[in-house]
Amino acid sequence: MRRIVYNISEIEPYINWLYFYHAWGLSGKPRAEKEKLKAEALDMLHSWEGEYHTYAVFGLFEANSEGDDIWLEGQKVRFPMLRQQHPAAQGEPNLCLADFIRPLSSGITDRLGIFCTTVDGGLEKKYRSDDYLNMMAQTLCDRLAEATAEKLHEEVRRSIWGYAPDEQLSIEDQHQERYQGIRPAIGYPSLPDTSANFIIDQLIDMSQVGIRLTTSGMMTPHASVSGLMFAHPKARYFELGQIGDDQLRDYAQRRGVPVQAMKTYLQSSLIKK
């Protein structure tokens, strides 16, 4: 298990400004508008150096898959996954993240990375008396949490896990996801169930970097990211899409969660009747 503290200046190069502009409604707007906002953002960012930091926790676990489940720590921890019920394109398989972990029947132990990243909680409260500065700080914090995940993933591939020690990718290449493996985050298209954060918390104790979970598995500070890291060379991102009542019930049973509660967690992923 690793807990890492980063200076703001270490993370700044990894920020994907396209998403920052999108958050401000500047996608497709003139470059001058974007550059003006970015200059203001950088001034704020640089004022945080030394006083505030970003944080990461990473754990590397022995893992094997069995059906749509990933088993960790010698089959002590079950991490159920969801499978596409409608492939993205005709002839494509219905994907599940468990597909990218060696099956238990192979007799070969695989590995799975589990992580979380966040920012100093004080940053989200620092500018509450000024709506504009508060929005600037919040959107910057969101980008910092994502950029910290990007830098952590680079370090994991090259050295911590070390499955791609000779990787030489620019940050732009990394933003284009040209690396080996994937880093799906909780709440994103292939992992929509926020309550999966309770399993992640059980494994890596997110409280050690100040992350707390709500009853639905949402994280505070808001500017936090959690998820999984897969090393399989053919692992790829995909969108789960909508699932039927049959898979909902099966998944709830595997998670040990009442079906009604799981319906709440997966509301946006359920096929509408």
Model-inferred region functions:
Residues M1-N134, T139:
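Active-site loops and adjacent core secondary-structure elements that bind or stabilize anionic groups
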Residues A56-D68, E154-R254, V259-Q267:
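Compositionally biased, low-complexity/repeat regions
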